[in-house]
Amino acid sequence: MKAKREALISLFTAIKEGKVDEDIIDLLMLINSIKGVYTTSSCSGRIGIIEEPSLGAKPLSRWLIKVHRPMEFEEAIDALKKANKGIIFLKSQPPILHVVAENLEMAKLLHQIGLSSGFKYTTFKVISNRYLVEINGTEYLTVPLGRDGKVLVSEEYLKFAVEIGNEMLRRGKSRLPRLYKNFQELKEKVGEDELFIALKREILGT
């Protein structure tokens, strides 16, 4: 699969440069080592504060802080000082993985793995003759905090919002071990990809 080769080169290079979420590296390596599947853009879950010029203007939005671990209250306070123009939101998002399958049968297996691992928003669709499975959780939180550099909530409420956002992030991440276990079982069933082994050795030296 030419597409898998390109995806693996991109992944291994990003890992080498320290650009991949540390708590999801092992899972991504496992999935990509399986015959007939590979990952594209994926995230281990994140929480942060974002500034959007207007509702829905995601391409022009600006993260004031974005971390893949629980956020400290002091970090939120410091981030809000950078706010300037637009609507300010606190956002917490669960892990999300995009996995491409080589055929419909494999896509169905991946879909079932996502659901059985607790990722209830898992879906799959066909894009440019590729079966793309999106493994996604339900733990999304978006809280408006202010506008145009002005925070419109109390410090007490901000602390509460950060606590809830962190709890939702932890809940989403808590499903990753089960997902890993289920992909390990799939690997034992379908086997390891030789292309993965070769490129891993070539790029990462392991």
Swiss-Prot record:
Reactions this protein catalyses: 4-demethyl-7-[(3S)-3-amino-3-carboxypropyl]wyosine(37) in tRNA(Phe) + S-adenosyl-L-methionine = 7-[(3S)-3-amino-3-carboxypropyl]wyosine(37) in tRNA(Phe) + S-adenosyl-L-homocysteine + H(+)
Assigned EC number: 2.1.1.282
GO BP terms in the entry: tRNA methylation; wybutosine biosynthetic process
Gene Ontology molecular function terms on file: tRNA methyltransferase activity
Described purpose of this protein according to its UniProt entry: S-adenosyl-L-methionine-dependent methyltransferase that acts as a component of the wyosine derivatives biosynthesis pathway.
Family according to the record: Belongs to the TYW3 family.
Protein name: tRNA(Phe) 7-((3-amino-3-carboxypropyl)-4-demethylwyosine(37)-N(4))-methyltransferase 2
Native species: Pyrococcus abyssi (strain GE5 / Orsay)
